[in-house]
Curated annotation (Swiss-Prot):
<feature type="disulfide bond">
    <location>
        <begin position="29"/>
        <end position="46"/>
    </location>
</feature>
<keyword id="KW-1015">Disulfide bond</keyword>
<dbReference type="GO" id="GO:0005246">
    <property type="term" value="F:calcium channel regulator activity"/>
</dbReference>
<keyword id="KW-0108">Calcium channel impairing toxin</keyword>
<feature type="disulfide bond">
    <location>
        <begin position="3"/>
        <end position="22"/>
    </location>
</feature>
<keyword id="KW-1218">Voltage-gated calcium channel impairing toxin</keyword>
<keyword id="KW-0872">Ion channel impairing toxin</keyword>
<dbReference type="GO" id="GO:0005576">
    <property type="term" value="C:extracellular region"/>
</dbReference>
<comment type="function">
    <text>Potent and selective blocker of N-type voltage-gated calcium channels (Cav2.2/CACNA1B). Also blocks vertebrate Cav2.1/CACNA1A (P/Q-type) and Cav1.2/CACNA1C (L-type) channels at very high concentration (2 micromolar).</text>
</comment>
<keyword id="KW-0528">Neurotoxin</keyword>
<feature type="disulfide bond">
    <location>
        <begin position="10"/>
        <end position="27"/>
    </location>
</feature>
<keyword id="KW-0964">Secreted</keyword>
<keyword id="KW-0960">Knottin</keyword>
<keyword id="KW-0800">Toxin</keyword>
<feature type="disulfide bond">
    <location>
        <begin position="21"/>
        <end position="48"/>
    </location>
</feature>
<dbReference type="GO" id="GO:0090729">
    <property type="term" value="F:toxin activity"/>
</dbReference>
<protein>
    <recommendedName>
        <fullName>Omega-segestritoxin-Sf1a</fullName>
    </recommendedName>
</protein>
Amino acid sequence: GSCIESGKSCTHSRSMKNGLCCPKSRCNCRQIQHRHDYLGKRKYSCRCS
């Protein structure tokens, strides 16, 4: 699952509560760089607010 805020897709991350995706209204997406992302894609982490 993923949540969306401002049109950005967020992947699961340890910053999520209970490892679940936050409701869209509470999803805060932040772009993060993954040095070891072999796909070279931008990753987004999701944090509950």
